[in-house]
Amino acid sequence: MLVAVQIIAILLAALSMTAALGHALEMPGKLRLAQEHYLAVQPIYYPGFTIGGGLGEIGTIVVSAALALMLPPGSAASSLAWAACASALIVQALYWLLVHPVNKFWLKDSEIDAASKGFFAIGADDQAGADWTMLRDRWERGHAIRAIFATLALVLLAASLAAA
């Protein structure tokens, strides 16, 4: 059972890292886009990145915490799993603080299903009148920072596996 949980944790962390890293790797090219093209591209990420990234991120938090509880308390493996869980929590916090408010702005005029409208309606609408380049930079940098912490979570889970 422990090995299965370790493998699932690493796969979920890899999914989380892939979504955030994908955004980070395309950043140099997207920063060269004119407003018209950038705004046309932004809505295409939904639903793939939203569903895949969300599943990976929430899954990493839950499964890495479960893994930490399954390992001997105070062991290096347990401590590393808890650190991975903390890193995954930071990835989620960064999403809600930096990325989600901008996603809400990008998708405000998009035709999406009712459940998605509900999801993107969560949180304050603090983007009214904001300059598009400020929103772009916030979104792009937010994903770059998230990629660092998502990668860290994956590395910590791999280290936990090695230490177990």
PLM region descriptions:
Residues 1-4, 42-52, 73-80, 128, ...:
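Membrane-interfacial loop-to-transmembrane-helix junctions in polytopic alpha-helical membrane proteins
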Residues 12-21, 88-104:
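Hydrophobic alpha-helical membrane-embedded segments
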Residues 158-164:
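Juxtamembrane boundary at the C-terminal end of a transmembrane helix
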Residues 70-85, 95, 101-102, 107-111, ...:
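Portal/gating segments that form or line small-molecule/metal binding sites
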Residues 13-63, 107-136:
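Interfacial loop at the N-terminal end of multi-pass membrane proteins
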Residues 54-67, 146-155:
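Core segments of transmembrane alpha-helices
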Residues 2-14, 66-92:
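Interfacial segments of alpha-helical transmembrane regions
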